[in-house]
Amino acid sequence: MMMMTKMFVQIAVVCLLATMAVVSAHEGHHHHAPAPAPGPASSSTVVSATNMFTVLAIAAVALVVGSNH
């Protein structure tokens, strides 16, 4: 059971880092694109931020559950 928890945490951390890298790379390309239309934030930015926090929360829960067993 401990091995599965460790593997799950490692996968969650890798997903978090990959998402952060993709968001950082995407934000770096904004200076080449034309100015966005005024209005609310794009949904892709919101979804990326939500995904990062979700993966971080899942990793934290997995760490807590793993440390209690």
UniProtKB/Swiss-Prot annotation:
Keywords: Cell membrane, Glycoprotein, GPI-anchor, Hydroxylation, Lipoprotein, Membrane, Proteoglycan, Signal. Contains 4-hydroxyproline; hydroxylated on Pro-34, Pro-36, Pro-38 and Pro-40. O-glycosylated on hydroxyprolines; noncontiguous hydroxylproline residues are glycosylated with arabinogalactan. It is a lipid-anchor; GPI-anchor. Residues 1-25 form the signal peptide. Glycans are attached at residues 34, 36, 38, 40. The keyword Glycoprotein applies. Its main location: membrane. The keyword Coiled coil does not apply. It is found in: Cell membrane. Proteoglycan that seems to be implicated in diverse developmental roles such as differentiation, cell-cell recognition, embryogenesis and programmed cell death. This is Arabinogalactan protein 24. A lipid is attached at residue 42 (GPI-anchor amidated serine).
